[in-house]
Amino acid sequence: MKAVILIPARLDSSRLDRKMLADLEGEPLIVRTWRQALKSRLAEKVVVATDSREIAAVLDACGAEVVMTSPTASCGTERIAEAARHIEGDVFVNLQGDEPLISPENIDLALEPFFSENPPDCSTLVLPLRPDDHVQIEDPHQVKVVMDAKGFALYFSRSAIPFQRNMRPTTIVYRHIGLYAFSADVLQKFASLPPSMLEEAESLEQLRLLENGFRIQCVTTLVDNPGVNTVEDLEQVRRIIRSSLPG
């Protein structure tokens, strides 16, 4: 079982332009994400998929493996599917390029189901929230997920799900962490499908899988790694990195 981490990276971003090259204490954001991915115990290879020559040049200088992709990809998963056609692998991880603090243990958690007797079509991570954490539950930028009794996703939404009409103290709300692992064939099938109705309504690419009958296994983690989507996120990550430096 050969696992490969693919990191989609584009230069333009709707909320924070050129964030992949943003400086994080002397190193570009995308380079820090790549270095964290290299620490995975289960993945044998890490590759960055980009349509930007500028990003590719920065990564080449660090010794990273890069695959150039088309600028027409509608989402990160389509970008890595294009790259995966040129790479030998049984399982491919889609690790967002804006995750410079990603825990290698979280990457391995997403991969572990594929080393079992009954590997899923796709796996992803979820983080339990307190029922009274209304800020995260109601934030449309924090995606929520509901699962069946076996831990497979029923639905992902930017809305608060489950709706809290009769919320019990024992009810757990789960936030989705956008790290995915796909079997090689499911990844290519995803890319061959057109964007789905619910995917476009919620702007959540994983709904394309659910609408087409694929099953997504959700693995619970207690480790939350802040990504970078806004200027405020960028400053928060800089503070975290700064506080971890010696001296």
Curated annotation (Swiss-Prot):
A Gene Ontology biological process term? CMP-keto-3-deoxy-D-manno-octulosonic acid biosynthetic process
**Highest taxon, organism lineage:** Bacteria
Q: Which named protein is this?
A: 3-deoxy-manno-octulosonate cytidylyltransferase
Quote the EC number.
Answer: 2.7.7.38
- Major location (coarse): cytoplasm
- Pfam families registered for this protein in UniProt: CTP_transf_3
The cross-references to Gene3D superfamilies, in alphabetical order and at most eight, read: Spore Coat Polysaccharide Biosynthesis Protein SpsA, Chain A
Q: Which InterPro entries match?
A: Cytidylyl_trans, KdsB, Nucleotide-diphossugar_trans
Tell me the NCBIfam families matching this sequence: kdsB (TIGR00466), PRK05450.1-3 (NF003950), PRK05450.1-5 (NF003952), PRK13368.1 (NF009905)
| Gene Ontology CC: one annotated term | cytosol
Q: Which family does it belong to?
A: Belongs to the KdsB family.
HAMAP family membership: KdsB
User: What pathway annotation does it carry?
Assistant: Nucleotide-sugar biosynthesis; CMP-3-deoxy-D-manno-octulosonate biosynthesis; CMP-3-deoxy-D-manno-octulosonate from 3-deoxy-D-manno-octulosonate and CTP: step 1/1; Bacterial outer membrane biogenesis; lipopolysaccharide biosynthesis
- Quote the subcellular location field of this record: Cytoplasm
Is Cytoplasm one of the keywords UniProt gives this record?
yes
Enzyme category, top tier: transferase
Q: Does the keyword Nucleotidyltransferase apply?
A: yes
| Function statement | Activates KDO (a required 8-carbon sugar) for incorporation into bacterial lipopolysaccharide in Gram-negative bacteria.
Q: Which UniProt keywords apply?
A: Cytoplasm, Lipopolysaccharide biosynthesis, Nucleotidyltransferase, Transferase
Q: Which reaction does it catalyse?
A: 3-deoxy-alpha-D-manno-oct-2-ulosonate + CTP = CMP-3-deoxy-beta-D-manno-octulosonate + diphosphate
Molecular function GO terms recorded? 3-deoxy-manno-octulosonate cytidylyltransferase activity
